[in-house]
């Protein structure tokens, strides 16, 4: 079976309500754009870009990675990881009244 493109799943992803932490390394060129796409598409998501890391950022910077993931879990557990403020979307930011 052919694997669908991530971008073809935008509607399904936009319906996700689970808290999501998207983590990419700033030197992982192939994952930066998909990471931004996921951040824009999943309302309860956050994007963490670790500097000077590639695709294996959990191995390259394990202390940083573990700290951020632990903080994410703590925020979710304590109800502090909220959906994105709808006013922050590009269509809302560019509105003129």
Spans of features found by a protein language model:
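Active-site nucleophile elbow and catalytic-triad environment of alpha/beta-hydrolase enzymes
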Residues: 1-12, 18
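Hydrophobic alpha-helical segments typical of transmembrane helices
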Residues: 8-9, 34, 49
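Active-site phosphate/pyrophosphate- and oxyanion-stabilizing loops and adjacent acidic/basic residues
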Residues: 10, 36-37, 63
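Short beta-strand/loop motif that positions the catalytic acidic residue
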Residues: 15-16, 22-24
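Conserved alpha/beta-hydrolase "acid-adjacent" motif
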Residues: 29-35
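Catalytic active-site module of serine/aspartate enzymes centered on a nucleophile-bearing elbow/loop
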Residues: 45-97
């Amino acid at each position: 079976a052919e694997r669908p493109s991530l971008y073809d799943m935008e509607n399904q992803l936009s319906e996700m309500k689970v808290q999501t932490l998207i983590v990419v390394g700033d030197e992982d060129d192939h994952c930066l754009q998909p990471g931004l796409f996921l951040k824009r598409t999943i309302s309860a998501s956050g994007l963490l870009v670790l500097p000077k890391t590639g695709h294996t950022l959990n191995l390259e910077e394990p202390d940083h990675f573990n700290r951020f993931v632990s903080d994410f879990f703590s925020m979710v557990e304590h109800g502090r990881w909220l959906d994105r403020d709808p006013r922050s979307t590009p269509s809302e930011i560019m509105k003129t009244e």
